[in-house]
Amino acid sequence: MRIGLFAVGRLKSGPEKDLAARYFDRFAKAGPAVGLELARVAEVAESRASNAETRKREEAAMLLKSLADGSILILLDERGKALDSEAFASLLGSYRDQGKRDLTIAIGGADGLDPSLYDRADATLCLGKMTWPHQLVRILIAEQLYRAVTILSGHPYHRV
């Protein structure tokens, strides 16, 4: 199953980008052994519209346009469901085992996500109750993708 990340906003060069790249690279190398591969990390510029609702609508349109047909869509939102690492790995494994070909994880912009995306989403998850800047969210989700691969493969990286 191909897993991609869609993010509103671009990471500038620096330690955050380097750390996210390190975990995406680990995921890309380890994932194929358990049937998961990194499709792409798509970054789009934040909308320049003058109001938040229009910005969210425009960003949602870019996301929907980038989705492969039949892609699973997981939104990251502070009001989403909190999963521990094992449950996240299980969720990915379950989509893989159902024969799903593509999965996209979406990180919204500063204004959040357009309401229309929640109807289209297969799941809405949070990375805790706190609000995180998108630079850190990328690192967190990249690490959790790598951790999910290690859990699914029985690798000792994930220790409880």
From Swiss-Prot:
Q: Which Gene3D superfamilies match?
A: 3.40.1280.10
What reactions does this protein catalyze?
A: pseudouridine(1915) in 23S rRNA + S-adenosyl-L-methionine = N(3)-methylpseudouridine(1915) in 23S rRNA + S-adenosyl-L-homocysteine + H(+)
Supply the enzyme class, top level. transferase
Residues binding S-adenosyl-L-methionine, per UniProt = L76, G108, L127, G128, K129, M130, T131, W132
Give any Gene Ontology cellular component.
Answer: cytoplasm
Extract the SUPFAM superfamilies matched here. alpha/beta knot (SSF75217)
* Classification via InterPro entries: Alpha/beta_knot_MTases, RlmH-like, tRNA_m1G_MTases_N
| Example of a GO MF term | rRNA (pseudouridine-N3-)-methyltransferase activity
Purpose:
Specifically methylates the pseudouridine at position 1915 (m3Psi1915) in 23S rRNA.
Quaternary context: Homodimer.
**What name does the UniProt record give this protein?**
Ribosomal RNA large subunit methyltransferase H
What gene is this protein translated from? rlmH
